[in-house]
């Protein structure tokens, strides 16, 4: 039970700092429970996050977050710390040698509010792969929790973040099986920081046996 904490399996960079990870960020979670969204329990779970303008990070080896049998609010490969509301354009996440994905998020039998591969300004060198299998079925009785959204590039709308757009040098792949969610975006860009967002690759969305709209 994570209570009212935020979870950063990889790195949190703040106060104008810089962090570099050379072997990637990987987290596997089972039976992680968050309180109802009305309690503002977990604003987000991120492989990496920036907290102040000017902070940035570089991750070689990619980010991978896997959840089973859990109840979550937001899951981001990388993004913006919810207390800061500022992003940065110097973030770079690159895939490991021999792998196609730079960011992978997989949910199984897990309820959520929002999933995003990347939700802050920066560059992703490699594919963004997001998959949800039996996500949000039979677990959502918390009102807004059921209003779920999946996006390859994060809107972050549940956090109301003024975030920069993301450039993806690769493909975005979204796969939903036996799920129930309201909104699915291949790419959803906020450009209010003045940056444009690009996907230099393909966007693929697969939905099967899902109550999505």
What do the predicted segments below correspond to?
Residues 1-213:
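Surface-exposed loop/turn motifs in large extracellular/passenger domains
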């Amino acid at each position: 039970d994570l209570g009212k904490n935020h979870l950063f399996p990889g790195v949190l960079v703040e106060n104008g700092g810089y962090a570099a990870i050379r072997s990637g960020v990987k987290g596997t979670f089972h039976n992680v429970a968050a309180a109802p969204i009305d309690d503002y329990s977990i604003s987000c779970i991120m492989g990496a996050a920036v907290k102040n303008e000017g902070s940035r990070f570089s991750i070689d080896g990619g980010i991978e977050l896997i959840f089973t049998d859990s109840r979550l609010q937001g899951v981001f490969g990388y993004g913006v710390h919810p207390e800061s509301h500022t992003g940065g354009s110097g973030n770079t996440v690159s895939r490991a040698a021999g792998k196609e994905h730079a960011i992978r998020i997989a949910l199984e039998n897990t309820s959520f509010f929002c999933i995003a591969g990347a939700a802050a300004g920066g560059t992703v060198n490699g594919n963004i792969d997001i998959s949800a299998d039996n996500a949000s079925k039979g677990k959502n009785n918390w009102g807004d929790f059921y209003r779920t959204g999946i996006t390859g590039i994060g809107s972050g709308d549940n956090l109301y973040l003024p975030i920069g757009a993301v450039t993806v040098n690769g493909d975005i792949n979204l796969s939903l099986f036996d799920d129930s969610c309201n909104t699915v975006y291949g790419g959803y860009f906020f450009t209010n920081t003045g940056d444009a967002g690009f996907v230099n690759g393909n966007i693929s969305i697969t939905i099967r046996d899902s109550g999505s709209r």
